[in-house]
């Protein structure tokens, strides 16, 4: 059985490809998701995707992953700087996660420099554009441990 990966994208990431392309590029979220699924499959893993602009929906999806997913890749979007609740959900399910940002948040506004996730993430990918998603999928597929069989 291959690894199971959950890719979560937070607020406004549904606008990838059209929102501030000078920062986020021209690739759509649908293209990112399709590319990530194909890459995961090429590595013997499966990948499920989820995007929401709502904090509670993201928390619900994280909680639903408990016992079903080997690793989470999360681009929390603006929730990076505000959501203790999503952080608590990630810690509560005990699934290792990668924090991902398309842009280099440390080269942007000072308020974007703080993350509620970075100190607990297994890894952080910042500023690689949408290529960062491929890097994250590969890392989880090749390096995270599979959950124990029940």
UniProtKB/Swiss-Prot annotation:
Please name the pathway: Aromatic compound metabolism; 3,4-dihydroxybenzoate biosynthesis; 3,4-dihydroxybenzoate from 3-dehydroquinate: step 1/2
A Gene Ontology biological process term:
quinate catabolic process
Q: Name one Pfam family in it.
A: DHquinase_II
PROSITE patterns tied to this protein: DEHYDROQUINASE_II
Q: From the UniProt record, which GO molecular function terms apply? A: 3-dehydroquinate dehydratase activity
Using the UniProt record, name the top-level EC class of this enzyme in a single word: lyase
Q: Which UniProt keywords apply?
A: Lyase, Quinate metabolism
CDD domains xref list: DHQase_II (cd00466)
Q: Which domain of life is it from?
A: Eukaryota
- Record keyword rRNA processing present: no
**Catalytic reaction equation(s):** 3-dehydroquinate = 3-dehydroshikimate + H2O
Q: Which InterPro entries match?
A: DHquinase_II, DHquinase_II_CS, DHquinase_II_sf
What Enzyme Commission number(s) appear in the record? Answer: 4.2.1.10
Q: What does this protein do?
A: Is involved in the catabolism of quinate. Allows the utilization of quinate as carbon source via the beta-ketoadipate pathway.
Name of the protein: Catabolic 3-dehydroquinase 1
Gene encoding the protein: qutE1
């Amino acid at each position: 059985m291959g690894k199971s990966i959950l890719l979560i994208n937070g607020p406004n990431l549904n606008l990838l490809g059209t929102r501030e392309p000078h920062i986020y590029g021209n690739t759509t979220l649908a293209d990112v998701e399709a590319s990530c699924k194909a890459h995961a499959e090429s590595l013997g893993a499966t990948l499920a995707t989820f995007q929401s602009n709502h904090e509670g929906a993201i928390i619900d999806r994280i909680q639903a992953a408990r016992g079903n997913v080997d690793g989470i890749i999360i681009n929390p979007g603006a929730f990076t700087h505000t959501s203790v609740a999503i952080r608590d959900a990630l810690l509560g399910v005990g699934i290792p996660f990668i924090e991902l940002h398309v842009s280099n948040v440390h080269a942007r506004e000072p308020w974007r420099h703080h993350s509620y996730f970075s100190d607990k993430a297994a890894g952080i990918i910042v500023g690689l554009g949408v290529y960062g998603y491929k890097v994250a999928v590969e890392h989880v597929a090749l390096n995270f441990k599979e959950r124990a069989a029940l």
